[in-house]
Amino acid sequence: GMVESGVDPDLIALEPLQSPILTTGKSGAHKVEGIGAGFEPPFLDKSKLNGVRAIDQEDAFNMCRLLAKEEGVFGGGSTGLNVCAAIEIAKEIGPGKRVVTLNCDNGLKYLGSHIYS
């Protein structure tokens, strides 16, 4: 991994703006599967985080559609959150730095859902 390679990455946790339990302590209804469960996960070690960001689910879903159309990358809502945050961070830190994010799953199971329909 990155740490074993001598890289000291900043780790940013993400959550849907509609359920910002980590950033505000308040949960809410949202449509991003597999994230923002409305409670702080017991395995989350906040001491290892450099920040937490709440991303609007609609921005994430729009990003999913854009990634599929422009890049041929299928992902679910959490992937959309990741890419939205990565773009925000890249703009903030400027040129000459690297931002790494993940595509959490493929979008096939979301084809008939609110994301791609």
Feature roles, as predicted:
Residues M2, C64, N82-A90:
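Buried hydrophobic packing segments
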Residues N50, N62, N82, N103-N106:
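Detector for Asparagine
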Residues V73-L81, V100-L102:
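A short, small-residue-rich loop immediately preceding and capping a beta-strand
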